[in-house]
Amino acid sequence: MRKLVVGSRRSKLALTQSQQFIDKLKAVEPNLEIEIKEIVTKGDRIVDKQLSKVGGKGLFVKEIQHELFEKNIDMAIHSLKDVPSVIPEGLTLGCIPDRELPFDAYISKTHTPLSQLPEGSIIGTSSLRRGAQILSKYPNLEIKWIRGNIDTRLEKLQTEDYDAIILAAAGLRRMGWSDDIVTSYLDIDTLLPAIGQGALGIECRSDDEELLTLLSKVHNDEVAKCVTAERTFLAEMDGSCQVPIAGYATISDQKEIEFTGLIMTPDGKERFEYTMNGTDPVELGKKVSNKLKEQGAYEIIKRLNEQH
């Protein structure tokens, strides 16, 4: 196998994720030579604005995809929730490895449970999905925008006027934070995860047969089916960063996929949700999106997209 170059964002989490995946590859192919090339993306350079206002998820992957096309790198290790639902022609997700915990972590300054926070308490999150679902269940709380890496957000919780923050559990775990700092992991009835949350997507060129063969050795087919249902739903709903959208799939012992899709307004007042079972992930994602469109969810999406 030739020497491989992995493209990674420069953040601590991205570099840690990349190294963890490289270790996984070396466990199946010990003689691999792999180097990491750090890439600063537009999303990393914009730290003072809400992502949904400056172009959304694709901000973290466009430059990396360009490096793949230019053959400066061989593969990129993305948090799947940052990857837009349509992959450019010529590139592919070569594998979906094991999924980390897909839920959200609620961290309270005083370790007060979410359901017991006093009226007017301030919760920090940079995600419309989290904000909308929290307001839907706890309309007496206040959502305040927060950006920055995990360390920055944990520091802001202590030094600024936040009573609690909500972060993806996967990032905390990959960075080695212990469960001690987490007040609770929120169940899907409280906070349905983002599409692809906790999963990684390994992107490479579609014609790179040698690499695709290697990647197939660390591919998790069950996780791939789940995230395919989730990402199909995202694509069908035309879900952008302006829209609070969530979706989560699991596989039962009977090998059936159960998928729940959710669309909301940012204020949490309108909610469209549907759960369905099936065996074909693409068909399942489409069926749930059709059900939500029948309920009127697409009107919300059109309205929110037109406002931006």
From Swiss-Prot:
One of its GO terms (cellular component) is cytoplasm. Its EC number is 2.5.1.61. GO terms for molecular function: hydroxymethylbilane synthase activity. GO terms for biological process: protoporphyrinogen IX biosynthetic process. Its cofactor is dipyrromethane. It catalyses: 4 porphobilinogen + H2O = hydroxymethylbilane + 4 NH4(+). The keyword Phosphoprotein does not apply. The modification S-(dipyrrolylmethanemethyl)cysteine is found at residue 241. Pfam families: Porphobil_deam, Porphobil_deamC. Belongs to the HMBS family. The porphobilinogen subunits are added to the dipyrromethane group. NCBIfam families: hemC. PANTHER family: PORPHOBILINOGEN DEAMINASE (PTHR11557:SF0). Monomer. Tetrapolymerization of the monopyrrole PBG into the hydroxymethylbilane pre-uroporphyrinogen in several discrete steps. This is Porphobilinogen deaminase. It comes from Staphylococcus aureus (strain bovine RF122 / ET3-1).
